[in-house]
Amino acid sequence: MVVWLKQPDGSCVPLVDMWKPRIHVGGALDDLLNLQPFIPTCKFINKFEKAGDRERSKVLEIEVENESEAQTLARQIFRRGGYSKYRLYDVDIPSTQMYLYSNDLFPLAFVQAEPVHGRIEWTVKDSREQIDYQLPPLRTVRLQISTMKSHRIQTFEDELNTITIQIRDENIVLDSGTEPDKLMRLVGAFRKIDPDIILTESGDSFIFPYLTRRAQHHGILHEMMLGREEVPLRIYEVQGHSYFSYGKILFKQTAARLLGRLHVDETNGFISSDCGLEGLFEVARTCIIPLQRASRTTIGTSMTSLQLYHAVKAGILIPWNKNEPEEWKNGNELIVADRGGFIYEPQFGLHESVGELDFSSLYPTIMRDMNLSGETVRCPCCPNSTNRVPELGWNICEKWDGIVSRSLDILLRKRLLYKKYKKEASDPPTRLRYDQRQAALKWILVCS
């Protein structure tokens, strides 16, 4: 794992940690013992297999090199068990996130790092709870290009016209020389400026794929290094993917990554385009999700990251390809329980003395205060709980704080404070900063 640290003097240094991700395998003890000889790197440990479990189970822990090996090995184990003997865990969690969870780190945290025998010992001198936290000195540039279009729509075959690098109010325009000259001057400018954050519009879908293709056309792709590591821009064979969300088929471009730098494509991300960099930083810190991932994923993914963190810290395994169905309800229970779609018709006409009630994060607050989570409603350990679901009478756990309620707590508390400080702020920049942060947290709470 390569971790980039931004030092107080503005310089950046890479640290290499020999940490490796781990996957876990559950099943009957005899089946696990039969599997053990085929995987020399495995060992038995005790973990909770489900969030609602009260006793730990004996599972196999297997150290793998990377996410690709984790997926391959998981499929082999699943197939070896006839697709029924073994339960796989912690297979599809991004290794960067698991590294943060395992070391109690979060993006942009103020830390002290000490290399020890190939590993890194971390001392965190920061807290996700902080409101007025200090960010590292980050250099931000905006990258734009224009092409000599031969068609109405830009293509990778169009010749490069100009490259513009915007730093605050200054524009650096690269428009002279041949096309290879412009590309190499861009590489030189990045080395000289050494930006931490590169802002683009359509950087994932066009700018960086275009620059890569033009460099390849001129045989200089191996010199096209825009990141901090000596790695050239990459040509992706598969550009993006489609996915289904809320009744729509959507398309997301493959992220263009510049190793050691953060690339934010404002057309391929929601939080940064709606809440600015301050909102993006707040989500990454609070939800413990890498900045590059937070800038492109949905708000649900950020919320999931926070829940995964609490599960990992509680010793709960994360199932692979989770498909646990909702508990069965009869018709009457469904009518009483599922009221989310009910809309009350208003009375038409002109009304006077009308009042308005506005609840701040109503549903997330109810879920936190009433301890509503998948493993706490109708739990087996508290059948006589005084905390019940109205009308249905279902018991809610009194012994265990649910994963959902734990995750919502920090979001609700911080958003309330940001709204308070926003009202009290006297200068517009401070007020805007608090507003962007609370707005970002509001979006995360929407998907709870």
Named regions from a protein language model:
Residues 1-61:
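Long, charged/polar, low-complexity intrinsically disordered N-terminal extensions
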Residues 3-5, 25-28, 139, 151-448:
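Conserved acidic
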